A protein has these predicted regions:
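Short, basic/hydrophobic alpha-helical segments
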Residues: 9-16, 112-116
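Short, acidic, metal-binding catalytic loop of nucleotide-sugar glycosyltransferases
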Residues: 43-48, 117
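Core AdoMet radical
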Residues: 1-8, 18-36, 47-68, 75-109, ...
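A short acidic, amphipathic alpha-helical/loop segment
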Residues: 13, 36-43, 68-75, 97, ...
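General structural signal for secondary-structure boundaries
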Residues: 1, 15, 177-178
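Conserved C-terminal portion of the radical SAM core fold
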Residues: 77-85, 103-248
Length: 251
């Protein structure tokens, strides 16, 4: 049988690659919980080549552990520049529901710490799915508010990221009932800053709601999945998103 155990990388084997690298991109699982990512950054520093490369890290922003006595904040200053992409689903406490058991306060605090690092920009990124699509403008508004606190406007950015799509993917936008879509579409017109500053993005998301066909079977699968997950976690979808109440039955 094939082994399910991960073979241990010998990071030293990547020395020749690092010497010629212009961008080091680290991803997860949870990127900042993987020791080998720190070993790679340390090797780049030891080889004196980190100053020549851009560092790109995608993280949930939920933790910043130390490995060998150092955390990510110790490594960022050694690189030419850095972009931290913080993966979220909602702006604010709503994020705690999907990204259970994360805490929004911790995520935002870490994002601010990333932004305080030298030559570092922070991007918030999310997927476009049945639960998030009605609230994505709130992420844009949250980023606009953050920009007001900092001298550089390009320090903070956001991206709506990947559209959840494909056969059998119950969290696709096609699972959203038409009455909820109407509510979300009306709500989109309340986000004047987002509409004005990023109209093409606003229009793309609005048209997803308007044009994607409703799939009743996929919707039922999604609701079953949500109800089972809520039962396991001790959470409740409609406590956070009351618009789903007509379609939700607590198990």
């Amino acid at each position: 049988k094939p082994s399910l155990l991960k073979e241990k990388d010998n990071v030293e084997d990547y020395a020749d690659i690092l010497k010629n690298l212009v961008e080091l991109k680290l991803v997860g699982g949870e990127t900042l919980a993987i020791k080998e990512n720190y070993d790679l950054m340390q090797l780049a520093v030891d080889l004196d080549v980190s100053k020549n490369m851009s560092l790109r890290i995608t993280t949930n922003g939920t933790l910043t552990p130390k490995f060998g006595g150092k955390d990510v904040f110790d490594y960022i200053p050694h690189f030419k520049d850095c972009q931290m992409t913080v993966s979220i689903e909602f702006w604010g406490e709503k994020n705690n529901y999907i990204r259970f058991p994360s805490k929004w306060g911790v995520t935002l605090e870490n994002a601010r710490k990333f932004a305080d690092c030298p030559r570092t920009r922070v991007m918030f990124a999310t997927t476009v799915n049945a639960l998030t699509i009605g609230y994505l403008p709130e992420i844009a508004d949250g980023v606009y508010e953050l920009r007001k606190e900092y001298e550089s406007n390009d320090l903070w950015s956001w991206a709506s990221g990947s559209l959840v799509w494909g056969a059998g993917n119950e969290y696709a936008v096609t699972s959203v009932p038409l009455d909820i879509r109407e509510m979300y579409m009306d709500k989109y017109f309340e986000y004047g800053d987002f509409m004005k500053k990023e109209f093409e993005e606003w229009k793309k998301l609005y048209y997803y709601l308007q044009d994607m066909p409703f799939d009743e079977e996929l919707h039922k699968e999604m609701m079953t999945n949500i109800q089972l997950r809520d039962k396991h976690r001790g959470t409740c979808l409609t406590d956070v998103f009351p618009e789903w109440e007509p379609y939700y039955e607590k198990l």
